[in-house]
Amino acid sequence: MLCIGNIERGDDGLGPCFAKMLKGKVSYEVIDAGVAPENQTGVIARLKPDTIVIVDAVYFEGEPGDIKIFSGEELGSGKISTHDVSPKLLIEYLKESTGAAIYILGIKPQSNKFGRGLSPSVEKTLNLLAEQLMEARLPSIRAA
């Protein structure tokens, strides 16, 4: 699991916050990539995963805190991420270097304005999702 985001920009920091919640509490590798996920590509390639789940704040129809699963191709094709740089290159590199299936677990942010802390709706979603992951109660991931 690759968690992305900037903790200095409100809900954009949901990835690193989620990584902190899960690290050491699940049976798979959780990487806090912060604002530079490209710096973790070597680590990920050495792990030889068959599936990579990228956790990030993503814009889509719905309410803040809503979750949507995207395929790597889906996110790479358009500007739905909160980041200025398209994640397309990262996704393509990870797919090429690992052969892994790549999914994006997108959580709709309420705000990505400067400032620390998550909105209540995003924090509630992360807590519920972390609880389910720690108890291994989630079904197989499928892109929407």
Predicted regions and their residues:
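N-terminal catalytic or cofactor-binding beta/alpha core of small enzyme domains
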Residues: 1-109, 116-144
